[in-house]
Regions:
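Cytosolic, long alpha-helical scaffolding segments
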Residues: 1-246
Length: 246
């Protein structure tokens, strides 16, 4: 085989490896989204069996995380990627950890939903919980879209939306405390509702993390622990950041 042909062969195999691992991440993301949607459906409809099924299916996400991690390790060991390819592999390794943790939180919501099934819930508190769940569902959908398309603008939307989710969680937490103080009989129910809200808030955090990795892939800049106003100044349309292709 000629040297030039060998180089093209190696390059083609490398691209196939990258596409394979990228496809596996998208498959994992789809499974995580399905698990989360089922957990929220269980909560909304009081479906105890569906909530427990979410918990039972969490192992599928864990298995995918291990497989993708092994794929990435092989690529790092055998292909020695550089520049944008290296950023992609690093971001994938980090992103699958956050996806797995979203799966864990979906499992937790499923278990809590099964406990809350058939239990009377305070209308105001539960309405806010459903609003929070809807916002986090949108965040997760936008996160997966941003990752699939390497869409920096969509990723920035998610980073900004996390502050709203945090505020909604704090409101639900304060209401839960109020309910427990006013009527000690509601303590168990209020605690479970608050833990669901806490899991939703954590899922929002993991979505934000993944979108920060998207910005890292596109621009080559690590924005963790950076103030939101500085992120917007850097990455919003007309900002200072420029895409890095190498």
């Amino acid at each position: 085989m000629e040297v030039e042909d060998l180089g093209q062969h190696i390059s083609r195999r490398f691209n196939e490896d990258l596409e394979s691992v990228r496809s596996a991440v998208l498959k994992m993301g789809g499974l995580v989204e399905a698990q989360f949607d089922n957990a929220i459906k269980s909560l909304a409809e009081g479906d105890s069996e569906l909530g427990l099924q979410v918990a039972q299916d969490d192992y599928k996400i864990n298995r995918l995380e291990v497989n993708i991690d092994e794929q990435c390790s092989r690529i790092l060991a055998t292909r020695a990627p550089t520049a944008s390819d290296l950023r992609l592999i690093i971001a994938i390794i980090k992103a699958i950890t956050d996806l797995e943790r979203i799966g864990d939180e979906a499992e937790r919501i499923g278990v809590l939903s099964s406990r809350l099934a058939g239990v009377e819930r305070p209308s105001t508190n539960y309405r806010e919980l459903r609003n929070l769940a809807s916002h986090v569902q949108l965040m997760l959908r936008q996160t997966l879209d941003a990752f699939a398309r390497l869409d920096a603008a969509e990723a920035l939307k998610v980073v900004k939306a996390d502050d709203v989710v945090d505020e909604e969680y704090e409101s639900i937490y304060r209401q839960g405390i109020t309910f427990m103080m006013e009527d000690p009989r509601t303590i168990s129910r209020a605690m479970d509702t608050t833990w669901v809200a806490r899991s939703l808030e954590r899922i929002g955090d993991h979505c934000k993390n993944i979108c920060e990795y998207v910005l890292f892939m596109v621009y080559g800049k690590d924005i963790r622990h950076t103030q939101l106003e500085n992120i917007e100044a850097e990455f919003a349309p007309g900002g200072k950041a420029r895409e890095r292709g190498s």
